[in-house]
Amino acid sequence: MKYMNHVKSGLLAMAFACAGICFTGCEDDVVINTGNSDKLDTVDGVYGYVKSAAGARELTPISVFGDKVATGHLYFELSKAAEQDVTVTFKVDEDVLEAYNKKNGTSYKMYPADKLSLANGGTATIKAGEQKSASVELNINAGGTIGQTYAVAVSASANNGVEVSTNNQEYIYLVKPLAAIPESISKGDILTHCFVEVNDENILNMGEYTMKSDGKPFFDVVSIFAANINVDSKTGRVHVFCNDQVSFLLRNADKFIRPLQAKGIKVVMTILGNHDEAGMGNLSEAAAKDFAKELKAYLDIYGLDGIDFDDEYTSYNNSNPSPGFEKRSRANFARLVYECRQVFGKKLIGVYEYGSLDSPDGEVEGVKVGDIVDYMTYGYYQNQNPNGAFGREESHFENLPKSKYAPLPWKINDELNGGWSGFDKSKFQKVKDEGYGIQMFYNPKPLMYQYYVLLSEISEVLFDDGVEWSGKYWSRTGEAYQGKMLGYEDLVGEWKVTSSNSLFTYVDEEGNPRWWDWKGSQEFEKNVIIEKDEEGTGYVVYNWGTFPEITGKYPMHCDYYNGALLIYPQTIHEGDAEDPATYKMHFGTYSKNFQWKAYPNYDDYYMDGAIAPNGDMHIYGLGNRWAINPYKYVGGEIETDIFPDVPYFVSENYTMKKV
């Protein structure tokens, strides 16, 4: 069979070495084995073309920072399996760039040729029976003028006298020399790490929190959560898969990743199982080596600082593993992180662990797991294991010191009131006192919460310093907004309150109550009025809840707590000559026969809140079937908790907007 000597000229997606490269661009799905065959020439129905690892697309701008070396990973792929070994030779090709400029009316200048080199002489082989060559590294050494944009083009040719296509296509990379980016800026002995769910959130938000004393970033490491490990059903090869949101971030690395790195924040990417057989704990040695090389291509091309592994959601087949897989074991996971260390150099390797088999242990080639990884974090949060996992590093891992372990992961999303649920300073004091070196945070919701109050509380324990917020917050796609920070004075005024839920009693045609049902979000009948109390430290709050005719006459007292409003059960009126009834605020929820039953035994609980970046206030309590309302007492007993005339009860949670 004839194989086209595809001279698909091309600048292939290049990689960044270490932390010093700026790259944007990847294919929409960022899957290495996906190509665009629409542009390809064929010879006898078989074609070959140059591709970049990590799915990087043509005309990707690559930034070379300081004296760092950028590294690209190129390979050659045929549309059908080779019948015999095919040798492919890549070369940097200025003629291709000139032709591209002429055809497209551009004037790209070639990057200095003496700063470019191809590993292994630019030679790679497609073995008989396979379609892809091994990858060849394209090294871009520092050179050129800072601020100027250059280009590089690469072409390829094949041996064995195969016919050359006359309709070549080119791949071109833009290269931008830039000043060096700073190394990590340490603020203390404890590294702060944050997993960001990029399906919804923007990692740039993590760079807006800084230490009060010197302006250093609060977060040391930000992890893109998450790309996936999957198996190609056709080839059986394990590869990286990125969904649209991760792909968008990688394609726009200069917009989302580089600004954090410029502040000294390391940006890593989490690899997560994805409901097929591919996992961290079942790769053969050969498969582990191959996958490690692919991960390195992602690090190089997108300028990432490391990889975190999270071995969840893999469908392990221990009874009959497919070729290339073995039975799941911690030893196999250890082999993977070992092979990653061999090719990653000083790049970060982290592990998110919460069970037993989902983490590496033991030693590989005489090297213990604790000496391979840079950090591990326990995976159960404050609502799942309030006491953390202190001491787990000794009982579960070979040679893992406390300095590399996070025993108290802290979830800071809306599920846990922005991180305030279960908050206890003494827990973080224990992290510090016992010599642990990692504090992990998970799933921030920066469009819902201002985190500087929470982070200050934690930072004052860990670092004896507070945290400031810039006031800026970012949408997922990169729109910047200016937020508003609220102090004690800012809560004074009129607020419109909207509940996330409400319940009403369905009444039949004969007037008989049948059942409670959801009525959805509702506004309070009257706006809430907040005034300062006499001491100037708390508030007097009017019109709260379902009965403003009572709470408007007898207001609550509330505290200023964690930057927001704290609401708690209390007596709002003691019976007197004018009104002998006593009114108390209790938590209550629905019951039968029009009852909204009070629970005085819950009087030790409270509702507290957090401030959104736009100045809205979110209030949370016992749950969305509960509310805090006034109950009338006569003779020391609740007179009634049956309210047939109330169309619905406004229940938690609440959003308050300043009028």
What spans do the regions from the language model cover?
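Generic short beta-strand segments
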Residues: S157, K496-F504, N543-T546, Q570-I572, ...
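Secreted glycan hydrolases and related glycan-binding modules that recognize and/or cleave
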Residues: E27-V86, V92-K115, G121, T125-G487, ...
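N-terminal helix-cap/turn-to-beta initiation motif at the start of protein domains
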Residues: A480-T498, E534, T655-V659
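Beta-sheet ligand-binding and adhesion/scaffold domains
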Residues: G483, H557-V659
